[in-house]
Amino acid sequence: MPNAQLIHTPNTRDLVVISDGTGITAEKFAHSLLTQFDIRTKTHRLPFIDTVDKAHEAVQRINDLASRAEQQPLIFTTLVNQELGEIVKKRARGFHIDLFNTFIEPL
């Protein structure tokens, strides 16, 4: 049986979902948005990122993905702790969408 891993094609992007909870809702939201575009994604959900050390580990994983991919990863975050969000925003190599600051904060 062939390897079930997704093979990257020019239209495949790494999608990284980072949350201080399970990340399930953020992942569903990200997939809903991305259905508007003709791209395939390989999803990497990083749940329970609730400490500075875990945020740095997440950044390292994202940057490892970015170094191997043709296109920058898409990063969707739902981190309540602003310090953790800033670590990801400033250090991760990818296109970052902070779902809390984009949608929740204006409410």
Regions found by a protein language model. Give the residues of each.
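Polybasic/polar functional segments that serve as interface/processing modules
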Residues: 82, 86-89, 95
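N-terminal accessory targeting/assembly segments
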Residues: 1-33
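Short helix-loop-beta junction
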Residues: 32-41
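Metallocofactor- and cofactor-centric catalytic cores in central/energy metabolism, strongly enriched
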Residues: 24, 45-65, 73-79, 83-84
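A general structural motif
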Residues: 12, 70-72
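Long, charge-dense
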Residues: 95-107
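Conserved beta-strand scaffold positions in the cores of enzyme catalytic domains, especially
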Residues: 43-46, 94-98
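Hydrophobic/aromatic beta-strand patches that form the interior of the parallel beta-sheet core
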Residues: 16, 76, 95-97
